[in-house]
A protein has these predicted regions:
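Surface-exposed assembly/interface segments
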Residues: 1-342
Length: 342
C-alpha cells in the first residue's frame, strides 16, 4: 500500500447493472432421445456431442452439419440440444425446452412428419424465433397442395423456412445452411447463393423449380458450376435475413432502453429526459447501420413532453417515439444493358 493509500482509501464499484441480451447465433436441436436426464444441454463442439451421442443418432448427425461449415461459412459458438420425451408432442417438448433454456434463436427438429412440422411452425410463430425444416416429399416439386411447403405457404408462415431435398432425411440440409449462416452479424449476410458442406445437390427441372418457388421452398442446386442454396426466403416469401434483422432490432432496442431505465436514479418526464431515451434509440440504429442492416439516412422523432397525453404522463408512459429506416436488403438479381460499336 502506498503512502497516499494509507491516507485516502477509495473503493470503486461498478454501478451499471447489465441486462441479458438475446443471442441470434445459437441453434436448438430438438429430438427424441434418452441419452441424458436433463431437459437441455449446451455444446460448443462436436467432441462434446460425440461424448453423449452415437454417430447414428439424429442429434449427432444434425450437430455435424451445424458445426461442420467452417470452410464455407461461420460456425455457431454453441448449440442447445433439447430432449423430447416419448409421450410428449413436439410442441409440448419445445415449450418445456424453452422454459429450461431460451437462449437459442433457430430451431432444427429431428422430424420430417408434415403434421409435426406444421405444429412446430405454428408454435414458433408466437415467439421471436425462427424454424428451419426440410422435406423429401415427392409432392413438393409438383403443383400438389398436401406437402408442408404448400401448407405453410398458404399460412404465410413468416418465421419458418423450408428446404426441399430428395435426400433430406440423411442430409439435414436446413442444419447445414443454419450452421453456415446463423453466426454472422444480423444484417451482414443474405442466405441466398450460399454454399454448404455435406449436402447432396438436387437435380431439378425448370418446372420443378418453378413449382417449388410457388410454395416458397428453398433448394440446393448447381448453378454456374457452384452448388448453392436458393432463394433464402421464409414461407411468406420474405428473406430469411430480413426477419432476423427485424428481431435483432426489436431485441436491441428493448434491451438498450431497459438498461438505461434500471441504471438511472430516474429519467425525468421532461424534454431532457426524453432525449435520454432518444439517444438509446439512436445508438441501436447506428449499430444497425454499421452492421449493414439498415441504410444511412434513418431518422428518430421524439415528442415534446407537453404533446404527450396528460393521462400517459400521469402513468409515466413516454412516447410515442418514432424512427424511420430503410432496410439495406441485398442484391439478388442484376439487369444490365450494354452498347458496343465499332
Amino acid at each position: 500500500m502506498s503512502d497516499l493509500d494509507q491516507i485516502i482509501r477509495i473503493t470503486l464499484t461498478r454501478a451499471s447493472q447489465p441486462v441479458a441480451t438475446a443471442s441470434f447465433q445459437i441453434p436448438l436441436i430438438l429430438a427424441s432421445f434418452t441419452n441424458f436426464e436433463e431437459r437441455t444441454r449446451v455444446y460448443t463442439d462436436m467432441q462434446g456431442v460425440a461424448a453423449d451421442f452415437d454417430s447414428t443418432d439424429g442429434v449427432y448427425k444434425i450437430a455435424t452439419k451445424l458445426f461442420g461449415q467452417s470452410g464455407v461459412g461461420a460456425v455457431p459458438p454453441s448449440i442447445v440440444v433439447g430432449r423430447k420425451d416419448a409421450l410428449e408432442s413436439w410442441v409440448e417438448a419445445l415449450d418445456a425446452v424453452n422454459e429450461d433454456n431460451s437462449t437459442w434463436y433457430v430451431l432444427v427438429a429431428d422430424t420430417k412428419d408434415a403434421a409435426d412440422q406444421e405444429a412446430l411452425s405454428d408454435a414458433i410463430s408466437a415467439n421471436r424465433k425462427i424454424y428451419g425444416l426440410s422435406t423429401a416429399d415427392a409432392v413438393a416439386p409438383t403443383t400438389g397442395t398436401t406437402d408442408i411447403g404448400a401448407i405453410l405457404s398458404a399460412k404465410s408462415a413468416g418465421r419458418t423456412f423450408g428446404v426441399y431435398l430428395p435426400t433430406a432425411a440423411e442430409d439435414y440440409p436446413e442444419a447445414a445452411w443454419i450452421g453456415a449462416q446463423l453466426s454472422y452479424t444480423p444484417g451482414s449476410n443474405d442466405w441466398d447463393f450460399k454454399r454448404v458442406n455435406g449436402v447432396t445437390v438436387s437435380k431439378l427441372s425448370a418446372t420443378a423449380k418453378n413449382n417449388l418457388r410457388e410454395k416458397n421452398y428453398n433448394f440446393y442446386t448447381e448453378v454456374g458450376g457452384v452448388n448453392i442454396f436458393q432463394d433464402g426466403n421464409m414461407f411468406d416469401g420474405l428473406p430469411i435475413d430480413e426477419q432476423i434483422v427485424i428481431d435483432w432490432l426489436y431485441a436491441r432496442l428493448q434491451e438498450s432502453i431497459y438498461f438505461r431505465l434500471i441504471n438511472s436514479l430516474k429519467i425525468p418526464m421532461t424534454n431532457p429526459g426524453l432525449a435520454i431515451i432518444e439517444n438509446e434509440i439512436r445508438t441501436v440504429l447506428s449499430q444497425a447501420e454499421a452492421n449493414g442492416a439498415i441504410d444511412r439516412g434513418w431518422s428518430v422523432s421524439t415528442p415534446d413532453v407537453l404533446s404527450i397525453d396528460p393521462n400517459l404522463r400521469a402513468q409515466r408512459t413516454a412516447g410515442v417515439f418514432v424512427f424511420r429506416a430503410r432496410l439495406a436488403g441485398s442484391i439478388r438479381r442484376v439487369n444490365l444493358e450494354g452498347y458496343l460499336s465499332v
